């Protein structure tokens, strides 16, 4: 019945809902928390979603005090995940469409009057609901400790997005008596409560994980919020985390510096989120990351965690968290200081390896992704180092790695041709594609390069130069392996063979497109014959019948 009503109201506008009579619709009762109320919750939320269509509709919904309060309570307190998600999204959408014009320190917003913001943060009853529902020290009827931690997780999931919309509303205090009751410092608001007081991180390691993820989301969501100060490479979110010691505390979990004595159990649960936090920090604020002591500390940690035996690389659990962090670092931080062995990249193997290690190499060698135009343009600190410096560093790392590991391309093509190990084969092909499509600068850089091998300026020419040429081009031109003629038909081997053949075909197509540009710009350098050969292979499609071993048996029906 409720689903039918939701379908019937599907095409309605908020104006039509109002004409039907908001007084006659039991929003407050229909938004009550309870297991038996879930269908009615969904119906009431579906009707209220009509108010997200325009600032005027949202402003009208903001005038319904008891309804807004009921939505906030339902979002934080319901035991139904679907209803909680729907209610949380409704609150975000109402706040977004009602956001006033852009203010200092805030992201670009809409043209609303801010009435929903004033209702949520300015009304005492609504504002206190955040604290009462999420604080472990307060007692709310029907809410156990587990229910409170769920409410905490829901608040931490949404708060970074609200901070990106209106930093001042989230960070500043609104009702001093409410905030003081929960030990919030003078001037602090909901952000201080969530980041500093709400979670008992020393006793609840799972909520500590959620808290670290919250810090990562906050740092990333607020990257465009300039501090309007002389501090370079900064944002309001990052500045907040540093000022309150949260940045150093979280980083220390991963770095495990001498004398820190981390709890082994806590480290086991928190190491991954802390590594992801640093990966977000390094990739979102590369200039800020490079300006401090963090590059050396992170590299020292990576040198320790990535120093594994060949057997562990190939057969044990991959150090995924460390590899993700290494792939997220500015490539300038991965350049060797002196000998090549001082770079963490030198520890990544190509022979006895795993897909995660090869994906990391592919990401590092490729260089920065090609930027798209965005508005407004990001603050200065969020594009530093620029793509030219990053591309030059990626090129230098690739050639240093190749000079010190001349078997690299032999290993890569061997892995790429091993259909039985699908993930390893696909990651090896990604290494080939990443170099072909590498975003390296064509201008001369002052970064030292090895003198024992050729160092072309572009990735596609690097593939066509020794020692890569001996292995990569024959592999790309060779027909793919297929198992269509074996007993069993199109089972898993066929699927793996097709996926690998398609990835290989895409790599060859990328090489073809770049060689076409090369021949047009610089004809007569001998690439025309290679281009013609590649064109013939591409004309055969991803699955060439020449790759089949043995003959297909034809059955003649007599």
What are these language model-derived features?
Residues 1-558:
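Extended alpha-helical scaffold regions
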């Amino acid at each position: 019945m409720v689903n039918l009503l939701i379908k019937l109201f599907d095409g309605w506008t908020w104006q039509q809902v109002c004409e039907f009579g908001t007084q006659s619709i039991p929003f407050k009762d229909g938004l009550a928390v309870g297991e038996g109320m879930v269908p009615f919750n969904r119906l009431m939320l579906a009707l209220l979603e009509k108010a997200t269509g325009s600032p005027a509709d949202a402003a009208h919904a903001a005038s319904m005090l008891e309804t807004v309060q009921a939505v906030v309570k339902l979002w934080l307190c319901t035991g139904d995940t679907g209803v909680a998600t729907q209610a949380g999204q409704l609150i975000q959408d109402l706040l977004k469409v009602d956001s006033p014009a852009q203010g200092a320190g805030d992201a670009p917003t809409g043209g609303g009057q801010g009435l929903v913001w004033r209702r949520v943060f300015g009304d005492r009853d609504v504002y206190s609901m955040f604290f009462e529902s999420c604080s472990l020290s307060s007692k709310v009827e029907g809410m156990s400790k587990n229910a409170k931690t769920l409410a905490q997780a829901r608040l931490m999931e949404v708060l970074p997005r609200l901070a990106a919309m209106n930093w001042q509303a989230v960070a500043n205090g609104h009702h001093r008596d409410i905030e003081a009751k929960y030990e919030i410092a003078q001037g602090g608001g909901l952000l201080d409560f969530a980041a500093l007081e709400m979670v008992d991180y020393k006793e609840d390691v799972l909520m500590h994980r959620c808290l670290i993820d919250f810090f990562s989301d906050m740092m990333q969501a607020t990257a465009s919020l300039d501090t309007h100060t002389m501090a370079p490479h900064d944002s309001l979110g990052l500045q907040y985390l540093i000022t309150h010691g949260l940045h150093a505390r979280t980083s220390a979990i991963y770095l495990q510096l001498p004398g820190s004595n981390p709890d082994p159990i806590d480290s086991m649960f928190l190491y991954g989120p802390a590594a992801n936090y640093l990966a977000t920090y390094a990739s979102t604020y590369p200039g800020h990351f490079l300006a401090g002591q963090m590059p050396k500390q992170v590299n020292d940690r990576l040198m320790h965690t990535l120093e594994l035996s060949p057997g562990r690389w190939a057969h044990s659990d991959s150090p995924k968290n460390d590899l993700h962090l290494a792939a997220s670092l500015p490539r300038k931080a991965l350049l060797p200081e002196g000998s090549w062995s001082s770079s963490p990249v030198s520890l990544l193997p190509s022979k006895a390896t795993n897909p995660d290690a090869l994906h990391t190499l592919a990401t590092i060698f490729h260089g920065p992704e090609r930027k798209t135009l965005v508005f407004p343009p990001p603050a200065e600190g969020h594009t530093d180092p620029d793509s030219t410096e990053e591309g030059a560093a990626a090129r230098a790392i690739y050639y240093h790695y190749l000079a010190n590991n001349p078997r690299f391309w032999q290993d890569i093509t061997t892995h790429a041709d091993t259909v039985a190990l699908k993930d390893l084969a696909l990651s090896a092909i990604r290494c080939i594609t990443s170099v072909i499509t590498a975003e390296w600068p064509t201008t001369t850089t002052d970064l030292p390069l090895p003198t024992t091998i050729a160092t072309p300026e572009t990735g596609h020419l690097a593939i066509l130069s020794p020692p890569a040429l001996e292995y990569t081009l024959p592999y790309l031109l060779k027909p793919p392996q297929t198992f269509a003629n074996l007993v069993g038909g199109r089972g898993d081997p066929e699927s793996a063979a097709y996926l690998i053949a398609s990835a290989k075909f895409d790599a060859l197509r990328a090489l073809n497109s770049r060689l076409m540009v090369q021949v047009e710009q610089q004809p007569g350098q001998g690439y025309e014959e290679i281009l013609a050969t590649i064109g013939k292979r591409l004309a055969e499609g991803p699955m060439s019948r020449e790759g089949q071993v043995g003959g297909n048996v034809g059955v003649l029906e007599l």
